[in-house]
Amino acid sequence: MSARGIASTLRASVAGLALLALAGCQSAIEQSYEPSVSPSATPQIVDEVQKNDPRAQMGAREHPRIVASYGGEYKDEKTERLVARITGALTAVSENPNQSYRITLLNSPAINAFALPGGYLYVTRGLLALADDASEVAAVLSHEMAHVTANHGIQRQQREEAEVIASRVVSEVLSSDLAGKQALARGKLRLAAFSRNQELQADVIGVRMLGEAGYDPYAAARFLDAMAAYSRFSSVDPDTDQSMDFLSSHPNAPQRVELARRHARAFGPEGTTGDRGRDYFLDGIDGLLYGDSPQEGYVRGQTFLHGKLGIRFDVPAGFQIDNKAEAVLATGPGEIAIRFDGVADTQRRSLTDYIASGWVTGLQPETIHAITINGLEAATARASAERWDFDVTVLRIDTQIYRFLTAVPKGMPSLEPTADVLRKSFRRMSPQEAAALKPLRIRVITVGPGDTLATLSARMMGTDRKLDLFRLINALQITSTIKPGDRIKIISE
């Protein structure tokens, strides 16, 4: 949840929370980030997009929306140089070597890359964190560049009008400006999605570009496998949202992996051809931000912490936290759902009056009570709508009102115990606590004598499945071994 976004009014209706409880954390509210990280003063790009190209105009129109939807631009000049180096090598052997590209690193933990008409290329820091070497990044970029050179973006533009119409219908049905805007944003993001035939065509072109640029042509199949493995890992990781990941818009059928391998064989047997570029890749991503950014706060196990806002709270055991820019969402067993957000306190009225001001549907006025939570002014109430019961808890800190909405199926006894965990755990952080919070980053280290998979993976932070994630980000199989002098990635502060 962003410190900037929390200051804007987030009209979270009780009905919307019921939808959250029904649909789960991924589909309730899609990510809609505000840009929070400034671009570099001298961004590394292959060339400027031609300003008189109508395709460039299409890309230029969508560019700000794409950037905003993925957390803004990520600032790291050495990483930008890495991606520009890879793109330059691919451009030289592409079907249109005169095509220029504007490369944007996106400040998102999602694993994604895509292209827009006019030579706009995007890659998330999450994808760079998963990749094992430069050839795997090249595999993704060559695939996206193939979409550009094959004019796939022009073909898919015809679908955009239908997306807008569908978004208007969603807005009318949900009777929510926020819902309509989010649906429209999802429609715009589908500009980056292609048909199955276009995907296969881009695969073929991309593998050829890989091999001709001197990269390992088998990297395409290898990274498709890596993304599938990450998807399986994430499917049981409660803190991972896959709604904006590459595989959500790029199907990963086994035949697609085999097709990539088959075309790679034209350059020679696997393991005998092409450069992986691992050393300069690792140099380029050392220190890369991993997971949540400071602007959005951090999820650590069952706890949400936000250093800039100076707050923290816990969710009950067994709940899954999804930290989005506009709110923190959590879902638990039995269709229990929680939403936490904040609004600017512009009127300085009592919190009991605030709860009764009309933003809660189905409010039971007789249940409104003023309370104190860890020394903070607060108020609670109950509400009911259709088959749902709700607890509403609000707290005031300085000029902000923080809001918890908890939903359970009607009559379920877990409403009070769930809300009680939130209320009792919410507190201000001390300046020392806030200062001690640090984001997680990719750290590149060299294996030393006596190091083992167990000892190295034990240094991983931000996950309970240390060995699994360690193997994943280092492309290590069950039978893989390491030796002194090898360079590997870990995740730490």
What positions do the PLM features span?
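Extended non-catalytic domains of envelope/secretory-pathway proteins
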Residues: G318-Q320, V328-L329, I336, D341, ...
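Bacterial N-terminal signal peptides that target proteins for export
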Residues: S2-A15
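Residue-level recognition of short, solvent-exposed, well-ordered loop/turn junctions
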Residues: L200, D314, G448, Q477, ...
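Primarily a LysM-type cell-wall glycan-binding module
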Residues: P431-D464, D486
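Surface-exposed amphipathic alpha-helical segments
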Residues: A138, I321, F404-I442
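Extracellular LysM carbohydrate-binding repeats and other cell-envelope/extracellular binding modules
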Residues: R465-E493
